[in-house]
Design a protein with these regions (language model features):
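Sec-dependent N-terminal signal peptides
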Residues: 4-13
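Sec/Tat signal peptide C-region and signal peptidase I cleavage site
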Residues: 15-19
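N-terminal pre-domain segments of enzymes
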Residues: 20-59
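Active-site mouth of glycoside hydrolases
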Residues: 56-304
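Catalytic-core region of carbohydrate-active enzymes that cleave or remodel glycosidic bonds
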Residues: 270-287, 296-314, 326-480, 485
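Long, low-hydrophobicity ectodomains and other hydrophilic envelope-associated domains
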Residues: 421-422, 430-634, 638-641
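Proteolytic-maturation and junctional protease-sensitive modules
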Residues: 625-665
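C-terminal beta-strand-rich structural cap/linker in extracellular carbohydrate-active enzymes
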Residues: 659-680
Length: 680
């Protein structure tokens, strides 16, 4: 009866339950889109969640590792984070102040300072080269005083707002022909130590402390996406007496094992020596890691303080002519990036972070990415998640998308960052209190590598995928999972063996991944203080729990992401306020997308374009027609459509439903992506 009432109310409001199917190659019409760029200036209280941060950053002492997690003197700490890439790390002082304030409003409490050591430009994509932290004097060694001053002022602003930093050291200096050689090249090793010393021991005039002694630093990464076990197989790192990768399988087992040990020792010695240098010579106290786990074998990382990983759903093929696979991860019944990369490479006993993650623009479904990651990161008990990237350019306040990975102007994604912060940082999504720990001894990893030599991080996923079902995708989606590198394989026989099904729900009952209708997947989060739907409604009523239900009308993609966050954390029936966000099709003004065809001339789900068809700001978006049923009394509930700054723009009528409960009907007529709800 409840569903019948909901359908009736929605139809009386003039809604449509027919979802427009996103067929292969379809590019929706821009008709009805409106400009909406979330403000870079002052914002209204309704969209300011900076109270989730504990300012100033570092007031409770240095972050350290205890019992496999990050803690400070106050207790456990999670890093709800983003990245700044390349010249975006060097804003003017005025821009730095606005940037720090804006990030804090979205509940971001850490920023990864990434790719500062090389001009980010034509080597990556056809845009003008911008400054790095090194002076343009040909030395590639001297820090640029102006860029260093800008960076240090930015860090001071972050600290004041309660935002920590992750210092990413070697990324792209000398570009990629040196990748991997730092494991055995003394000259490169010396330059890495020199850069670390210059950057970490310089006294910041705005904080009075060098980074090595400043608790604003949360963690330090030695290298980005760089490991001997990967670069050897890519062909750009090989000593004259080493076999070629193609020759490995032909060698006797003893020689293969000896070569594995050679690579393992070279790499682990380098990481351990750099960690010791930072600790003993520079006085660094915070956790240190080497590189991402997907780039090497776990035995090479044993000496590090925590583990880190990266993942992208449908990473674009970049160039003047680019291509993007335009598919929604919610339609992958196998778990997408979560089970394919992130969960099976989480090793037990140490903190785990994901310092880069994105569903890159112009994916029409990009808004699903961060909510799905943050919900599962909270459930899995991870220690940090970093949206990649806040910005990649020196234009710190873009009005549109300037690159595939930036979030600063990506309205459809950014508006849900508040729900992400509530789920992960505030802990509104509960962690699995028990979890499972499949055993995968380091010796097993080595033995599998000998039979099928490949880049290091792929070995763990290979073993996970060939298990007997006790380390299956379903296990990882239903239970907190951490691979025990020192465990007894006999333990694996006692783990639950999950059976396949179209609906996967976490053991806590708060997260549901539903593929009952193929091609119309749904991802739902049901907690007392955060409700989330992302996917293809297909005319269904979404019961989000605690008296909250959602019905979505016709959208341009037949798809939407909707989040509802309680500001006070007291639920949606009690006195207080909440933020409702509903997003859909969003892209640059005047963007031109081309539908790709396969070799047989059939349309595919890939979209592509040329850089000069990329379009410009402002971001154009659609308003989502939906009916939201709340547990609060209609007589005590008010709702307002908000403008780009979060200020009240127009009141939304609240209707009285069954038992006097509140019913909201939102839609494109309000020309907004977010709404404030108040219960008195």
């Amino acid at each position: 009866m409840k569903k019948i009432i909901l359908f009736s109310l929605f139809l009386l409001a003039g809604g449509s339950l027919s979802a427009q199917e996103l067929r292969d190659g379809m590019v929706p019409s821009d008709e009805g889109l409106f400009p909406f760029v979330i403000t870079y200036g002052e914002a209204a209280p309704a969209v300011d969640y900076s109270f989730l941060l504990d300012a100033p950053a570092g007031k409770d002492g240095f972050i350290r590792v205890e019992n496999g997690h990050f803690v400070n003197d106050k207790g456990r700490i999670r890093l709800n984070a983003t990245n700044l890439t390349a010249a975006a790390n060097f804003p003017t002082h005025e821009q730095a102040e606005r940037m720090a304030a804006r990030m804090a409003r979205f509940g971001i409490n850490c920023v990864r300072l990434h790719y500062m050591d090389w001009p980010y430009g034509p080597e990556n994509f056809p845009l003008a080269k911008e400054p790095s932290i090194f002076a343009n004097d040909g030395s590639e060694r001297n820090l640029d005083p102006e860029m260093l001053d800008r960076l240090e002022y930015l860090i001071a602003q972050f600290k004041q707002r309660g935002i920590y930093v992750n210092v990413n050291l070697y990324v792209a200096r000398y570009q990629y022909h040196y990748k991997g050689q730092n494991a055995f090249n003394p000259e490169i090793q010396a330059k890495e130590r020199e850069y670390a010393k210059d950057l970490l021991t310089h006294v910041n005039p705005y904080t009075g402390l060098p980074l090595a002694k400043d608790p604003v630093v949360a963690v330090i990464e030695l290298n980005n996406e760089d490991a001997l076990f990967t670069r050897y197989f890519s062909g750009n790192v090989r000593k004259p007496d080493w076999p070629k990768p193609s020759e490995l399988k032909k060698l006797p087992e003893g020689e293969r094992r000896a070569f594995f040990k050679t690579l393992e020792k070279l790499e682990s010695d380098h990481w351990n020596n750099m960690r010791t240098y930072l600790r003993d010579e520079l006085g660094v106290r915070v956790p240190i890691t080497s590189t991402q786990v997907s780039y090497t074998v776990p035995s090479a990382l044993e000496g590090m303080d925590y583990y880190d990983n990266h993942a992208y759903w449908r990473h674009p093929r970049i160039g003047v002519y680019w291509k993007q696979d335009n598919v929604a991860m919610v339609n992958d019944p196998n778990g997408g990036t979560l089970t394919g990369n992130l969960i099976p490479r989480r090793y037990a006993g140490k903190p785990y972070t994901v310092s880069e993650y994105n569903h890159p623009y112009p994916s029409f479904f990009g808004a699903e990415g961060q909510p799905m990651l943050h919900a599962f990161a909270a459930f899995q008990g991870w220690d940090g998640v970093f949206a990649y990237s806040w910005n990649n350019r020196m234009n710190e306040e873009p009005q549109g998308m300037e690159y595939f990975f930036s979030y600063a102007a990506r309205t459809d994604c950014l508006a849900h960052f508040i729900a992400c912060a509530a789920m992960f940082l505030r802990g509104d999504v509960a962690e699995d209190p028990e979890g499972v720990a499949p055993a995968l001894p380091l010796k097993t990893v080595e033995d599998v590598w000998l039979t099928n030599p490949k880049r290091g991080g792929d070995i763990v996923s290979t073993i996970a995928k060939t298990s007997d079902g006790r380390f299956s995708n379903l296990t990882m989606l239903r239970h907190k999972t951490a691979v025990d590198l020192h465990g007894d394989p006999e333990v694996n026989k006692t783990l639950p063996k999950e059976e396949a099904g179209p609906v996967n729900t976490t053991c806590t009952g708060e997260i549901e991944w539903n593929n009952e209708i193929p091609g119309s997947g749904m991802f739902l989060v049901r907690t007392p203080n955060v409700k989330l739907f992302s996917g293809f409604p297909a005319g269904r009523v979404m019961d989000l729990g605690n008296g909250v239900s959602l019905v979505v009308g016709e959208t341009k993609l037949g798809w939407t992401t909707v989040s509802l966050t309680s500001r006070e954390g007291k639920g949606f029936a009690a006195k207080g306020s909440s933020l409702l966000v509903a997003t859909g099709y969003t892209h640059n003004k005047d963007a031109v997308f081309t539908v790709e065809k396969d070799k047989d001339g059939k349309l595919t789900k890939a979209v592509s374009s040329r850089w000069y068809d990329w379009g410009t700001g402002p971001m154009m978006t659609e308003g989502i027609p939906a009916t939201v049923i709340l547990p609060s009394a209609a007589s005590a509930t008010k709702c307002w459509a908000l403008d780009e700054s979060g200020a009240r723009m127009k009141e939304v009528p609240v209707k009285r439903g069954a038992s006097g409960k509140a019913i909201l009907e939102i839609g494109p007529q309000y020309r907004t992506v977010w709404y404030e709800i108040s219960v008195q």
